[in-house]
Swiss-Prot record:
Subcellular location: Cytoplasm
GO molecular function terms noted in the UniProt entry: DNA binding; tyrosine-based site-specific recombinase activity
Function: Site-specific tyrosine recombinase, which acts by catalyzing the cutting and rejoining of the recombining DNA molecules. Essential to convert dimers of the bacterial chromosome into monomers to permit their segregation at cell division.
Family to which the UniProt record says this protein belongs: Belongs to the 'phage' integrase family. XerS subfamily.
Domain Core-binding (CB), chain residue ranges per copy: 16-121
Domain Tyr recombinase: 169-354
Major location category of this protein: cytoplasm
Annotated catalytic residues: 210, 234, 306, 309, 332, 341 (o-(3'-phospho-dna)-tyrosine intermediate)
Name of the protein: Tyrosine recombinase XerS
Length: 356
C-alpha cells in the first residue's frame, strides 16, 4: 500500500475511534511504531469495538462512544465470547468459506488489544498522574500458539531458502535470465526498475533486515565504505547492521540511475523509490512483496521477503555456528528464535554425512 493511501486509511479509522484510542495512537507514534503496525492495530480495534456495540456489551450506538468504563469492567467471559465470535465468522477468513479466522489472526487481535490495555492501565497519565484505570482483563486471557515442532518448521521452510550458491544464483537470474521470460511489452517495465529491484533483494539477502526496515532505509543510512546500513528496529531502536560485500555492486548500480530514472530531488531522502505521475516517493512494502514473489517464482519457488531474511540467517549460522551472532544480525533480543536455523543446518549436515 502506498504511504499516501495508508495515511488516508488511518485517518478514516481515527475518525470513528474513541478519544482514548486516538491518545494511544499519538503516544505510539512517538515510540515510534510504524504506520503499518498502527494501521493494523486500528483495524483490530474497529473490529473489537464494533463487536462491543453489536453484541450489546457496550450500550451505545457507535464505537466512538464506547467509554473507558466499558473496557475497565469487561469480563474474561466477555473476551472469550469475542474470541468465539471470531472463530465462528467465516467471512473474516479469506482462505475458507467454512471456518472462522485462523489462530494466528486471533493472536494478532489479542496482541493489539493487550497493547491498548497496557497503555490505558500502566502508561497513560490522567490529571492526577494516574492511569485511566488499573484492571487489565487482557492479562487473564491466554493465547494459543500454533503447534509445530522445529523439525516440521525446518522441513517446511528449507525448500524456500536460497542457500549456498543459490543466493548469488537468484541475483544472477534476475540480472541476466529473467528478461528472457518476458513479452516485449513487459520488457520496458522490467528494465526501468531492474537496478532498484536487484538492490532491494540484495540488501535483504546480504543483511537479513526486515522488509519494514528495508523500505525505510534513507540515503544517509547506507555506508558503502564500512558496509553498514542503519535501520530502525522494532520498538524504535536504531541499529547499525553490517551487510555482506556481494550487495555493494548492486547498490552502486542503482545509485547510478536513481536520480535520473526516478526524477529525485534533494528532498527525496528515501533510498528505494518509485515513480508515479513523475513524482518520486518511497517504495511501499506491498510493492517489494510483489517483486520478490515475481522474481522468485520464475527462478525456483515463490517466496516472501521474510524468507530472504531466513536465507541470510541460515547461511550466517552455517558459517559461524553462533546463535548469538545471528540474533544480533537479525535484531533479536534473545537467541531462542534462532533455534530454527540451527535445526535447518543440522539437517543439512546430517544429509551430507549420510551421503559419504
Amino acid at each position: 500500500m502506498k504511504r499516501e493511501q495508508l495515511i488516508q486509511n488511518i485517518e478514516k479509522l481515527k475518525h470513528v475511534m474513541p478519544p482514548y484510542v486516538l491518545e494511544y495512537y499519538q503516544s505510539k507514534l512517538t515510540v515510534p511504531y510504524s504506520l503499518n503496525t498502527l494501521y493494523e492495530y486500528l483495524k483490530e480495534y474497529e473490529r473489537f469495538f464494533s463487536w462491543l456495540v453489536d453484541s450489546g456489551v457496550a450500550d451505545v450506538d457507535k464505537i466512538t462512544d464506547v467509554s473507558l468504563s466499558v473496557l475497565e469492567n469487561l469480563t474474561k467471559r466477555d473476551l472469550e465470547s469475542f474470541i468465539l465470535y471470531l472463530r465462528e465468522r467465516p467471512r473474516l477468513n479469506t482462505h475458507s468459506t467454512r471456518y472462522g479466522v485462523s489462530q494466528t489472526t486471533i493472536n494478532r487481535t489479542l496482541s493489539a488489544l493487550s497493547s491498548l490495555y497496557k497503555y490505558l492501565t500502566e502508561e497513560v497519565e490522567n490529571e492526577d498522574g494516574e492511569p485511566y484505570f488499573y484492571r487489565n482483563v487482557m492479562k487473564k486471557v491466554q493465547t494459543k500458539k500454533k503447534s509445530e515442532t522445529l523439525a516440521s518448521r525446518a522441513e517446511n521452510i528449507k525448500g524456500k531458502l536460497f542457500l549456498g550458491d543459490e543466493t548469488q544464483g537468484f541475483l544472477d537470474y534476475i540480472d541476466s535470465e529473467y528478461e528472457k521470460t518476458l513479452s516485449n511489452r513487459a520488457h520496458s517495465s522490467f528494465f526501468k526498475n531492474k537496478e532498484r529491484d536487484l538492490a532491494i533483494i540484495a540488501l535483504i539477502l546480504a543483511s537479513g533486515i526486515r522488509l519494514s526496515e528495508a523500505v525505510n532505509v534513507d540515503l544517509r543510512d547506507l555506508n558503502l565504505n564500512t558496509m553498514i546500513v542503519e535501520v530502525t528496529r522494532k520498538g524504535g531502536k536504531r541499529d547499525a547492521v553490517p551487510f555482506a560485500p556481494f550487495a555493494k555492486t548492486y547498490f552502486e548500480r542503482y545509485l547510478e540511475v536513481r536520480s535520473q530514472r526516478y526524477k529525485t530531488t534533494a528532498k527525496d531522502t528515501a533510498f528505494f523509490v518509485t515513480l508515479y505521475r513523475d513524482i518520486a516517493s518511497r517504495i511501499d512494502p506491498s510493492s517489494v512483496e510483489k517483486l520478490v514473489a515475481k522474481y522468485s517464482q520464475a527462478f525456483k519457488v515463490r517466496v516472501t521477503p521474510h524468507k530472504l531474511r531466513h536465507t541470510l540467517a541460515t547461511r550466517l549460522y552455517a558459517q559461524t555456528n553462533s546463535q548469538v551472532l545471528v540474533s544480533n544480525q537479525l535484531g533479536h533480543a534473545s537467541t531462542q528464535v534462532t533455534d530454527l536455523y540451527t535445526h535447518i543446518i543440522n539437517e543439512e549436515q546430517k544429509n551430507a554425512l549420510d551421503s559419504l
